[in-house]
């Protein structure tokens, strides 16, 4: 799954998501099966956003949300289930954009905050919250400064978290801190050289 995500192989991600979705449909009371369907649809949505296919991103995110909601209703005590639901809400918000994003923006932050409350030591919980803050405007409780703090917290917990360095770079660039953004992208590429999107972000970020 990560290999296909890193390579932006949408055809493979579509196959994987479709297999796990079919399995989850047959095992409606299996929280883990629901989670895997949510996770694989989230990976597909992530790459669709990266290649600017908003239609597919929204469809995959909304499909995944259905499974994530089911996994949370079956086992509400598992932080990772809340994180993936929040991530999918954030992806749907990012795909829709504008005022339409508000429909999912609150769900993104509420669910990821629940994940952080349940497990405050998991770096990916802060990465997901940071992505939610990145897409939600400051006027609605998000914003790039909060996002930067979340990504820095994830890195403090795990300095080898490539995704945290990658998203820190994206947020720093949005804050017009290009030199720092480049350093973050360079670290992300060093930690995960297979990640196509990280290389693309580095290439398009000016030195100053």
For each feature predicted by the language model, list its residue ranges.
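N-terminal leader/linker segments that initiate helical-solenoid repeat arrays
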Residues: 1-46, 51
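Residue-level recognition of tetratricopeptide repeat
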Residues: 5, 39, 46, 87, ...
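Helix-start (N-cap) detector for alpha-helical repeat units in TPR-like alpha-solenoids
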Residues: 31-32, 79-80, 123-124, 162-163, ...
């Amino acid at each position: 799954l990560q290999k296909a995500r890193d390579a932006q192989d949408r055809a493979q991600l579509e196959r994987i998501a479709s297999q796990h979705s079919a399995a989850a449909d047959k095992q409606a009371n299996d929280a883990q099966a629901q989670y895997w369907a949510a996770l694989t649809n989230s990976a597909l949505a992530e790459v669709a956003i990266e290649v600017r296919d908003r239609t597919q991103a929204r469809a995959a995110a909304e499909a995944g949300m259905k499974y994530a909601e089911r996994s949370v209703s079956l086992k509400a005590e598992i932080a990772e289930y809340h994180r993936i639901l929040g991530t999918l809400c954030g992806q749907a918000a990012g795909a829709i954009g504008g005022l339409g994003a508000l429909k999912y923006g609150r769900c993104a932050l509420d669910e990821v905050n629940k994940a952080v409350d349940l497990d405050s030591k998991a770096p990916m919980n802060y990465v997901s919250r940071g992505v939610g803050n990145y897409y939600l405007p400051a006027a609605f409780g998000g914003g790039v400064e909060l996002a930067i703090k979340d990504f820095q917290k994830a890195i403090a917990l795990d300095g080898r978290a490539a995704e945290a360095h990658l998203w820190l770079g994206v947020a720093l660039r949005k804050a017009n801190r290009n030199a720092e953004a480049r350093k973050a992208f360079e670290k992300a590429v060093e930690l995960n050289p297979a990640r196509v999107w990280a290389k693309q972000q580095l290439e398009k970020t000016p030195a100053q």
